[in-house]
Amino acid sequence: MTASITAKTCEAWFLLEAADMRGLPAPYDVSVTDYGPVKLGLRSVDDLLVWAKSLGVDVTERQHGERIHWNTSGVLHDIPVALFVVTNVEQVAS
């Protein structure tokens, strides 16, 4: 049981760190498109929801059509993405 909780905690923190590295607003905002580069194998929104559920983490869709600012090599892109907010990470870590 401890190994499972440890693995979940590591995965949850990886999720947060990856979101932060990509400059997403707030530490818990993620999107399917943002996870392609970190090789989590998420190909769709359903993949994201299944993966988050396996961690015991709640994921809810934000307002459709929200935009994020993506800074790549000093170039700012204002792009629409399907954002999801991840909550209850504390439960995973405990």
Language-model features, listed with the residues they occupy:
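Structured alpha/beta or helical-core interaction and ligand-binding surfaces enriched in interleaved
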Residues: 1-94
